[in-house]
């Protein structure tokens, strides 16, 4: 069986309802309805893929697999900016708001570069609180789940130092990556429990919090002196004052500086996302407006059942929107044929159920429309992830018709910590979601 067949050779759990797509309001061809004259083949144009996706960073397969498990498909702005530079081994200063993915920058790039040697620490990460240290260690564990040879340890005050010493004495348990607070790490170095002569990468997270305080800065300096002169140094923070920047640079050699706009918003996979509040009977009118007004390379429209997929696909084609439907209600052979037709860009509109919402890589999809809201946040993640894969820009629009839809929308915003606003009445500038 081919890889394509593997991707779509299973039945989606669909609602066996008798619901069909909402009928067109009338057939007089007015703007806003699924009517003749809306030839989408004249809309938009194919856009090359030039922006960065995680796979384009040439990360180890084990890292890409872990990233996929986490549901991440597109790097945030700070990740697109910093990861390539970090992988080149250069020193980095990065300022970006909390929640924009700074931690993943140094976690992924250090895991990419680490070469584990028993009894040696090659990556040292420092932060100002034990809570943050524990959180960073957990991120390392999450992204190194397919790298069993990599050991990560966390060290902070408030615990018996002898336990840390025992861990570090044993080559079998000695971490290759150490995360900790300056006070405890300096004590371990001072008492010769921790040797840092093999450190290749030195990271300060929330560096301003450590370098602002005289005592903590002194600990950082002592630890820094215990590491080799030739190493990579990376510093990250949500806030960097003009007074702190020169202090940071004293630890570095010709660092590249990355300052992500304060107004940058974290969005799910870097996609723009909106919802449209409307009644069930208004869905076709709004869908027609979107297909007419929005520029796109390819669009995927998600519905909740095979019957609705079939009916909506039929309605679209009757109204001169050439589309195909992919769902479990057609034979495996036919499903593969349709999938290939869409993948090869012979059709630009696809109506699908959740069978097409998982693991399908089609570079040109940059618009996803939830004609029917998904059942939960996980399904939403898989659906809208179809738009803007491979690091391209993308847009996702969800139709919200009832209280259940609103509950799902709220759950999505809470789960992914992403506000999803209402679709603007005056539309969206195509340059914000079409790759240039």
From Swiss-Prot:
Residues 1-33 are annotated as: Disordered. Residues 270-431 form the Helicase C-terminal domain. GO terms for biological process: mRNA 3'-end processing; mRNA export from nucleus; mRNA splicing, via spliceosome; subtelomeric heterochromatin formation; transcription elongation by RNA polymerase II; transcription-coupled nucleotide-excision repair. Residues 1-16 have a biased composition (Acidic residues). Residues 83-258 form the Helicase ATP-binding domain. ATP binds at residues 96-103. It catalyses: ATP + H2O = ADP + phosphate + H(+). GO terms for cellular component: chromosome, telomeric region; spliceosomal complex; transcription export complex. Pfam families: DEAD, Helicase_C. A motif (Q motif) lies at residues 52-80. CDD domains: DEADc_DDX39, SF2_C_DEAD. It comes from the Eukaryota. Belongs to the DEAD box helicase family. DECD subfamily. PANTHER family: ATP-DEPENDENT RNA HELICASE DBP3. The Q motif is unique to and characteristic of the DEAD box family of RNA helicases and controls ATP binding and hydrolysis. ATP-binding RNA helicase involved in transcription elongation and required for the export of mRNA out of the nucleus. SUB2 also plays a role in pre-mRNA splicing and spliceosome assembly. May be involved in rDNA and telomeric silencing, and maintenance of genome integrity. This is ATP-dependent RNA helicase SUB2.
């Amino acid at each position: 069986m081919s890889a394509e067949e593997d991707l779509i050779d299973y039945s989606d759990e669909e609602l066996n309802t008798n619901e069909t797509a909402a009928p067109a309001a009338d057939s007089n061809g007015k703007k806003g309805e699924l009517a003749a004259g809306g030839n989408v083949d004249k809309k938009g144009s194919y856009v090359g893929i030039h922006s960065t996706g995680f796979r384009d960073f040439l990360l180890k397969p084990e890292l890409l697999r872990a990233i996929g498990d986490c549901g991440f498909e597109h790097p945030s702005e700070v990740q697109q900016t910093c990861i390539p530079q970090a992988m080149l081994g250069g020193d980095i200063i990065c300022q970006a708001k909390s929640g924009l993915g700074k931690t993943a920058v140094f976690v992924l790039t250090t895991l990419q570069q680490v070469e584990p040697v028993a009894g040696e620490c090659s990556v040292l990460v420092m932060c100002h609180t034990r809570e943050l240290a524990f959180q960073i260690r957990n991120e390392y564990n999450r992204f190194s789940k397919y790298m069993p040879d990599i050991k990560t340890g966390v060290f902070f005050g408030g615990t018996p130092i002898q336990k840390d010493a025992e861990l570090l004495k044993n080559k079998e348990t000695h971490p290759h990556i150490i995360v900790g607070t300056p006070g405890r790490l300096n004590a371990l170095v001072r008492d010769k429990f921790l040797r840092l002569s093999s450190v290749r990468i030195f990271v300060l997270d929330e560096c301003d919090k450590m370098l602002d305080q005289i005592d903590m800065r002194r600990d950082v300096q002592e630890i820094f002196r215990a590491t080799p002169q030739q190493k990579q140094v990376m510093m990250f923070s949500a806030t960097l004052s003009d007074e702190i920047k020169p202090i940071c640079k004293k630890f570095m050699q010709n660092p590249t500086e990355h300052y992500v706009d304060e107004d940058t918003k974290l969005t799910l996979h870097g996609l723009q996302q909106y919802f449209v509040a409307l009644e069930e009977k208004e869905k076709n009118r709004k869908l027609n407006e979107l297909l007419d007004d929005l520029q796109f390379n390819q669009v995927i429209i998600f519905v909740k059942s095979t019957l609705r997929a079939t009916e909506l696909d039929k309605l679209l084609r009757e109204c001169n929107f050439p589309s195909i439907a992919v769902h479990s209600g057609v034979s495996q052979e036919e499903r593969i044929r349709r999938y290939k037709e869409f993948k090869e860009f012979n059709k630009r509109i696809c109506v699908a159920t959740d069978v097409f919402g998982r693991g399908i890589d089609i570079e040109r999809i940059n618009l996803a429309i939830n004609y029917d809201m998904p059942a939960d946040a996980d399904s939403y993640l898989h659906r809208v992830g179809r738009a803007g894969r491979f690091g391209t820009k993308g847009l996702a629009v969800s139709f919200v018709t009832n209280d259940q839809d609103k509950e799902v929308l709220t759950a999505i915003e809470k789960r992914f910590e992403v506000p999803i606003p209402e679709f603007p009445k005056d539309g969206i500038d195509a340059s914000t979601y079409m790759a240039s």
